């Protein structure tokens, strides 16, 4: 997820078994939610793959994102990923935004209301170029899941 971590714990079972469980959990969560892994579900969706069936982790973060988006009156918006990348803060290539037309074209790709999670577990985006970025929520979700695991 584009970051490092340090976990300290005490356990009555061997540390290597706990570490294997942590590694497995992080693998699953990264495979679902990391924009820094090209083969993660969210990266595939961001490239326009509408056939990806998301797992329960993606669904949980999607639902929380919707809740926060509504509570904030739209100020929290996971579709700002294209802007995040354009200004050099994300995993994708930096784009120099030189004109207001370029900025306007990216702004058209924002708006959480343009993204839907279908009952079949696939994600529908009004425009295939919409870039979803859950990083504001995903890291906290990972910590919560780690707490459940431990």
What does each model-found stretch correspond to?
Residues 136-150:
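Cysteine-centered nucleophilic/redox motifs
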Residues 1-135, 148:
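A contiguous, well-ordered beta/alpha segment that forms the leading edge of an enzyme domain
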């Amino acid at each position: 997820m584009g970051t490092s971590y340090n976990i300290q714990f005490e356990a009555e079972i061997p540390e290597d078994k706990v570490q294997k469980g942590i590694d497995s959990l992080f693998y699953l969560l990264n495979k679902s939610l990391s924009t820094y892994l090209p083969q993660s579900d969210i990266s595939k969706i961001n490239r326009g793959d509408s056939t990806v069936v998301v797992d329960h982790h993606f669904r949980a973060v999607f639902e929380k994102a919707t809740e926060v988006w509504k509570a904030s009156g739209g100020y929290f918006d996971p579709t700002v990923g294209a802007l995040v990348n354009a200004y050099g803060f994300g995993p994708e290539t930096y784009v120099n935004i030189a004109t207001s037309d370029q900025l306007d074209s990216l702004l058209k790709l924002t708006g959480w209301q343009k993204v839907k999670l279908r009952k079949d577990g696939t994600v529908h985006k009004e425009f295939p170029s919409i870039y979803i970025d859950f990083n504001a929520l995903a890291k906290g979700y990972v910590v919560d899941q780690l707490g459940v695991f431990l």
